[in-house]
Amino acid sequence: MKKNQFLKESDVTAESVFFMKRRQVLKALGISAAAFSLPHAAHADLLSWFKGNDRPPAPAGKPLEFSKPAAWQNNLPLTPADKVSGYNNFYEFGLDKADPAANAGSLKTDPWTLKISGEVAKPLTLDHDDLTRRFPLEERIYRMRCVEAWSMVVPWIGFPLHKLLALAEPTSNAKYVAFETIYAPEQMPGQQDRFIGGGLKYPYVEGLRLDEAMHPLTLMTVGVYGKALPPQNGAPVRLIVPWKYGFKGIKSIVSIKLTRERPPTTWNLAAPDEYGFYANVNPHVDHPRWSQATERFIGSGGILDVQRQPTLLFNGYADQVASLYRGLDLRENF
């Protein structure tokens, strides 16, 4: 794997500005304004997001042991870990960016069970400790591009998904990989109430083609900024596919199933004209309601310092992944 050529020191994203909002999307889906008026003290105004010290600190995750392969490092300095995860997209805990940090402490991540099933010769079940001990962990500094036209760079910690799938031995019938988030309404208020959860159908589901899942860039992620993932960021394990829009990065995964047919995915079910199965970052294919040609890079500065920059095809990973889609119409298969 060649060294990523698109990252430079100034690209590293401040942890205090990790996520942004998708309220416009929910309005388009017909979700009532009541969903945006939840009586929660954590519903801060957007400007407070840039103040840094006003955001609740991330829950302390345990330090992880991991390597730092040179191909993914670029010697980039990182923002202190106590500013991570102030704003998140995790609708199971509410729509506002402050809601997951405020509410995700209710999620019990240990014990945890992750099952790998379907078109495999050797079905597997992993427990909480397996996620951080069974595979060598490595830190990878990846660009992350949200479908909402903002971007950042994050040092994820995890292991390539292909290593896990190889243990399960996919059969010749396996063509796709389906992922599912835990369904725990008693712990996740957004799964109990459609207004809190944005009207989505739960549990959250995602999917990849098998060749996408087996690509070396695709990461099963268990940590960020040197420590185990906090619950609002998808603990104990989430998916990162850096050349795709962020909603493909399903959180708190309990099931991975290899299938013959293309699996359903949550945002595609909710709005198929707006969110495709592939969700590859593409500056030439706009969202129906906004351009994808440029993006707001979110760094450590204030609101006036947010810079707009050109969106890179496949989020800057075209050299590594473009061959996966040779001959595929990327406008039709968005």
UniProtKB/Swiss-Prot annotation:
Enzyme class: oxidoreductase
Catalytic activity: L-methionyl-[protein] + a quinone + H2O = L-methionyl-(S)-S-oxide-[protein] + a quinol; L-methionyl-[protein] + a quinone + H2O = L-methionyl-(R)-S-oxide-[protein] + a quinol
Cofactors (names): Mo-molybdopterin
Example of a GO MF term: molybdopterin cofactor binding
Keywords (A to Z) from UniProt: Metal-binding, Molybdenum, Oxidoreductase, Periplasm, Signal
PROSITE patterns (alphabetical): TAT
Maturation and modification: Predicted to be exported by the Tat system. The position of the signal peptide cleavage has not been experimentally proven.
Assembly, per entry: Heterodimer of a catalytic subunit (MsrP) and a heme-binding subunit (MsrQ).
Job of this protein: Part of the MsrPQ system that repairs oxidized periplasmic proteins containing methionine sulfoxide residues (Met-O), using respiratory chain electrons. Thus protects these proteins from oxidative-stress damage caused by reactive species of oxygen and chlorine generated by the host defense mechanisms. MsrPQ is essential for the maintenance of envelope integrity under bleach stress, rescuing a wide series of structurally unrelated periplasmic proteins from methionine oxidation, including the primary periplasmic chaperone SurA and the lipoprotein Pal.
Protein family per UniProt: Belongs to the MsrP family.
UniProt name for this protein: Protein-methionine-sulfoxide reductase catalytic subunit MsrP
Natural source organism: Escherichia coli O7:K1 (strain IAI39 / ExPEC)
